[in-house]
Amino acid sequence: MFNMINLLDLSLEDLKKWMIENKEKEFRAKQVLDWVYKGVYNFEAMKNIPKVITNKLQENFYLSVPSVVQKYVSKDESTVKFLFKYNDGNIIESVVMKYKHGNTICVSTQVGCKMGCTFCASTIGGIVRSLSHGEILGQVLKAQEETGERISNIVMMGSGEPLDNYDNSLNFIRMVNAENGLNIGQRHITLSTCGIVPKIRQLAEENLQITLAISLHAPNDNIRRKTMPIASVYSVEELIEACNYYINKTNRRITFEYALVSNLNDKEVHAEELATLLKGMLCHVNLIPVNKIDEKDFKSSSTNRIKNFSNILLKSGIQTTIRREMGSDINAACGQLRRRYVKNNSKEV
């Protein structure tokens, strides 16, 4: 298998080229991928594909759709959390959230994470490896198979930093957006980053209409550096400049994620400072009650303080929402289930 290629890493054009190089008709490429997107991962089960082609496919490709290690469904059935295992034994998490407007999946782009944000369980233990775009796609396909429902929205907010896995993240976006793929509109895809400034500027040149979400979590450098190592590399000023560049290039509104930690970044003065920082920007602030992590000592802000923080931003003309908690009874916050599983089971490869 080590010399074989994950078929999910091939675009339609890639597979067409392979068919031609192997003396087969290029239309067979679409037929094969149609089966894959219908959830058929066994080449021999692709009924309209001749045996001679399925034999060649089996000799050259494998389909890396992860297996389900654990599956948790919240009491209200609005959230389904998966622990997926890849062929090399590595574990990642994906979460499906069901809304009235459709089903959203939160995908992981790396096994673990090296960014070191102190309120995130994904980064405990560091990074193991990045996922290929086909492996990220496999999360969506497997989730659809398990839930029996179509995924209509994607958020790249699971474990890992998407911009630290730049090429695979972009290839994944283009594959799920393709008409011959899942045909999910770019405006239904959100990429979240801790703020790698050069990559934000690079992303601005890609001619994409996705939503960019920035994990900001502080109105100034002093506070941000206490929780996010990336803040020692790029200042808040540099980050905001890159965001304005992105907005001007794409004409797309940016979302700023702000996890509220009691007595760290949740006071009125912090809200006022944040309002000043974001004044005039085409942006939206998503306030997040911080999740409890076993290994960390952070405490979420009180409901009253969160509402007060939100009101200050709203009165300053900043579009603001408070994230609805989903799946808290199944530890659906990023990285928590994987961390617990890895801790209690055999070492990852």
Swiss-Prot record:
[4Fe-4S] cluster binds at residues 113, 117, 120. GO terms for biological process: rRNA base methylation; tRNA methylation. Its main location: cytoplasm. Binds 1 [4Fe-4S] cluster. The cluster is coordinated with 3 cysteines and an exchangeable S-adenosyl-L-methionine. Residues 99-329 form the Radical SAM core domain. Its cofactor is [4Fe-4S] cluster. Gene3D superfamilies: 1.10.150.530, Aldolase class I (3.20.20.70). It holds the Pfam family Radical_SAM. It is an enzyme of class 2 (transferase). Disulfide bonds join 106-334. S-adenosyl-L-methionine binds at residues 160-161, 192, 215-217, 291. The keyword Transmembrane helix does not apply. Keywords: 4Fe-4S, Cytoplasm, Disulfide bond, Iron, Iron-sulfur, Metal-binding, Methyltransferase, rRNA processing, S-adenosyl-L-methionine, Transferase, tRNA processing. Reaction proceeds by a ping-pong mechanism involving intermediate methylation of a conserved cysteine residue. Specifically methylates position 2 of adenine 2503 in 23S rRNA and position 2 of adenine 37 in tRNAs. Belongs to the radical SAM superfamily. RlmN family. This is Probable dual-specificity RNA methyltransferase RlmN. The gene is rlmN.
